[in-house]
Design a protein with these regions (language model features):
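A short hydrophobic beta-strand segment most commonly corresponding to one strand
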Residues: 93-98, 123-125, 139-156
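Short, flexible loop/turn elements at secondary-structure junctions
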Residues: 59-61, 72, 97-103, 128-130, ...
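Extracellular structured ligand-interaction cores
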Residues: 52-55, 63-65, 92-96, 131, ...
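A short beta-strand-loop-beta hairpin characteristic of the jelly-roll/cupin
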Residues: 90-119
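A short secondary-structure junction signal
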Residues: 67-71, 78-80, 106-112, 136-137, ...
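Conserved metal-binding segment of the jelly-roll/cupin
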Residues: 116-132
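Non-heme Fe(II)/2-oxoglutarate
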Residues: 1-57, 65
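Conserved short histidine dyad/triad with adjacent acidic residue
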Residues: 57-90
Length: 157
């Protein structure tokens, strides 16, 4: 997925799209049914509070990044509409699950806060409208899993 336009973030901010190198803002993604079976088993570990979950595995190669953006949760919103899901009393959330210990050059920032000491299995919750970015300035691929669904506010605070 090419992320240079950051889902319209630059346009919403009223600024020009930065002049990034063309091949820098790319992330490899595997969605839902194309993910290996173990990915869906991981999702099961969150089903006591994450409802209607869908999964994505991301691979960010060295020298690549995902510029500041706000998640639109497009695939999740499509699923809710298509399957007429009852999400009353819940908010959309994205769980960013780290599939490896942090390595040199692996970077995540959410609302101006960086997380530099995560371990494999740690996760963070990305709420709607939170500006965040990731980068791989290291020498090995960076792997994460996204679990996107709906949760009750009291379950994620």
């Amino acid at each position: 997925t090419h992320t240079v336009y950051s889902g319209g973030f630059w346009k919403d901010m009223g600024v020009a799209v930065p002049d990034y190198p063309h091949d820098a803002p790319w992330v490899w993604q595997v969605f839902e049914g194309d993910c290996p079976s173990w990915v869906h088993s991981v999702l099961d570990n969150f089903d006591d509070w994450l409802h209607y979950g869908i999964v994505t595995v991301n691979k960010l190669m060295p020298g690549r990044f995902i510029a500041p953006h706000v998640d639109t949760l497009y695939k999740m919103r499509q699923k809710v509409k298509r399957e007429e899901m009852n999400t009353k009393g819940m908010v959309p959330v994205r769980v960013n699950l780290f599939l490896q210990d942090r390595l040199m050059g692996h970077y995540i920032e959410i609302e101006n806060e960086s997380w530099l000491d995560y371990k494999k299995g740690d996760y963070t919750i990305i709420r709607p409208n939170l500006v965040h970015s990731v980068a791989n300035l290291g020498y090995e691929p960076r792997f994460t899993m996204q679990l996107t669904g709906f949760a009750k506010e009291e379950d994620i605070t």
